[in-house]
Amino acid sequence: MQLEAISITDHEYLTRLPSNDEIEIINGVEVSVSWEELEESNAYAGLHLLLYFIKKDSPVEIFLEEIRRLKEIRNLEIIDNLQNEGLDIDKSELNNFKTRVPGRPHIASILKNKGYVNSINEAFIKYLGNGKIGDSRSHQPDIKKIIELSKESKSLVFLAHPHTLMSNEKFSKSENWVNETFFSHIQDLASFGINGLESSYSSYNKSITGQISNIAKKLNLLECGGSDYHGDIKPNINLGFGYENTPIKVPYEFLEIMKEKHAQL
């Protein structure tokens, strides 16, 4: 088995890398979004969309600049809220990270390094998750808007790590969330115009991947896969590895179908 293709989907920031003779590179980006219909329940952990085949200066690429601006405002508000709670954290500490667009995971890392929490996950549970003082959904674009912009831009849009629709657990290995409510939410997303689901994911076993794959087929949606590698921010995920540290395998057929779909747009 060898790596034939890859897409590096940074949050809210698109980097265009050229393909070469050995590895095919697909441009892409990951975007955090809100979904108003689910806001009241506070049940989901945070929704992310994966966008692929983004044309230069397309509507969705232009809108990414606005998303980054809102994210910077949100980061400062979160830190202000944490300071008001008595936590010793300064805005300048975000500059210590080698990233163009710091996010909540970086704030979580600061909290962990200062001993306020024992893990990144605990930081989200106590301070940064939905309904907490670091809740950031008010600064996130609506999911329907991003899907619509993606359609206008002739890009493909997928739901990343689908368990976040149903679970507050950061890495859910339980299968309880793959149920009728989950299927209903995916039906809604399909009606909005989403193209597919991330069925292969680092914390999914074969059973969960199979169930999501079956839902995708039932609703005529495409499939993609990824490790969700974030470096030190997610130390339990190794680059290219998935469930129980086995190599994550995403069929090249997924990309072939994606390219066929994209050519029809």
Predicted regions and their residues:
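Flexible, D/E/H-enriched segments
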Residues: 265
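Domain-core and long-helix interface of multi-subunit machines
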Residues: 73-222
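A metal-dependent hydrolase metal-coordination microenvironment
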Residues: 1-103, 192, 198-219, 223-234
